[in-house]
Amino acid sequence: MLRRVLALICVAGAVCSAQDTEADRSALRTDLEPALSFEAAPSGDMPGGWTGGPAGTIFAETKIVHGGKGSVRIERNSSSGNEFSTVTKSIPIDFSGTTIEFRGFLRTEDVSGFAGLWAREDGEEPGLAFDNMQNRQLKGTTNWASYSIKLPLAAEARKLFFGILVVGTGKAWGDDLELLVDGKPVWELARTKTPETTVIDRDHQFDHGSGIVVTQLNSVQIENLATIGRVWGFLKYYHPKVTAGERHWDYDLFRILPSIVDAPDRASANASLVRWIDALGPIAACNPCAKLDSKDLTFGPDLEWIKDQQGIGSDLSRRLRSIYNNRASGLQFYVSMAPGIGNPIFKHELGYLQIKLPDAGFQLLALYRFWNIFEYWSPYRDIVGEDWNRVLKEYIPRVVLATTSGDYERELMAMIAKAHDGHANLWSALNARPPVGPCQIPVNVRFIENSPVVTAINSSTSDSAAPLKVGDVITALDGAPAVELIEKWKPYYATSNDAARMRDITHDMTRGACGDAKVGVRRDNAELALTVERVASPPHDLVAHDLNGSTFRLLSKDVAYLKLSSVKADDVPHYLHDADGTRGLVIDIRNYPSQFVVFALGSHLVNVETGFARFTGGDLSNPGAFHWISAESLPPETPHYPGKVVVLVDETSMSQAEYTAMAFRGAHAIVVGSTTSGADGNVSPFQLPGGLQTMISGIGVFYPDKTPTQRLGIKPDVEVRPTVAGIRAGRDEVLEEAVRQILGSNVSSEEIEKITKR
């Protein structure tokens, strides 16, 4: 994350500062010390002084402790919401120092993912510094042991969040925590900064629930809820009281919602909205007024609806148009732009991890928040391919009437999938995406020739998958035809195109209950019914389709091969040295690059300045408008690689991988393979109620001629797809074509197959 905006330094007089510091530090110690030792009285199941969730996974513990009388227990099973649970606390960073240390004792039992301490510093933007012990992989069953994480204290940091988390399933206990700055307990530090507070810090009316209950909806209510969803979003980004941060806009939604839900007709609901807007105060005439500059405009905000007097009434229409016409500046409380990049940074979008479902207010808030963020800040709104207004109305009853966390998460997934943005997934709740289950058949599956095909057997659990063979076409799972299951699951997979959707579905499709699974396969010309064991499967990333083994190798004296899944920018000179004298270089991006090497490598593939991308970005003064903002090019560097360059891509090539392929294509590389995932551009993350994590593509990425890449993906110059026969024979048909492009058609297929054999 980019780092900016210094916290305000306290400039009060010495006597005042000393008195404030003593009182504040005493209060901080009184609150924090018993919470860290878990000796504070619990609040229901939750340890005293802490928040966390999802509900039903965090417990105050008295039987298993490290010291004293209490500890915290995090307990997750296959039905727990989200992909992780966390107990959380926060304090203002009103002190100075060099290093924050968060340490304590942890104990685990059957943790499938990992457990750990975590801490995060936030400023104007989140994540200035972060650690969650993921790299230590604390999993399985362990006795009490001491752990520590350290963060450099950023000057911009305003708030510290910290706690304990568990990813996957299992149990973890925490106790006897300490929070230190440069070795001292935090409450012993002098107060050197005045913590900035916002209306969100002061308004706590709905911290424990919106109080809004909805058990059914009629057509009038749905229309009215769609209207307030759009009005609430418009005011969030255009009304000066909201953009200045004077209103807790989430909670203001809960204050108006009851009158909208209870309105007998559209006119009554519209009248309530008029009174709501009037209560915010008069709109001052703008001076100067913001203008929508048509220069370099790609598309403007979709605001025709505020002129629809028949639909929203003349009074409401007049007020909304007045607010729009008197917009004055680019000041935004809920969003800023990343300097030098231009993607939105979403601020003050709270995750409300503590809410208990069902809660119609918070569920509506989740829908409205995502819908409006996409409406006003997605550079690809114009190619969504859906009637985005209809999506809002369609999902109001589906999201609001969900009664369990799983149903709530799946309905949000289905709504988000309508955005057709591969970055816009419900990333923290993928365990709720069908098929659901804690176990999986230990094989890799890929969609080949319009069928799910086994492409690899997991060697560590090969006995469980013994009946299956590489090249088997899966035709059924537990008695249900695979083609029907895939169609049933498709709506929940948020991707930019079908290639990426089938990539994700085949990645998940063997999940389910642990134990035996019935699998129908087609092997050669035979239809087989097999019994295969599903086994516990920790969270894992998508499978790369590059070659196993070393990052760089010579396939022959004439062909060099470099895969980007393990590439290191510092090693580029070594790769180029070792490739010297070859006729061609294969760059395999059928993966996600381990490091950003667009310039470190790409600049050695050109001998003149070569443009390869153009970008679009949003407009803080005109939310919903997007402009061309910059272009990018490769500057030539020595040594120049003079040979032919072939880039390999497929459906696993996403985001940074696609951007890298664009750059190398600009350097006149030949792209071989199949369509990529079509999700490009720096991402802009934010939270949804329930502690759910999502994001959108934050900037538009285009070729120099303004041809889009989003949804379309990187189209190969030479299209080659793997075949079932090739998979069974252990061939890499995409790599074979790359070698053929380098060596020419005179080289026999047998020789090429020998060079590329996996």
Question: Residue locations for each model-derived region?
Answer:
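Extracellular and organelle-lumenal recognition/adhesion modules and their flexible linkers in secreted
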Residues: 19-198
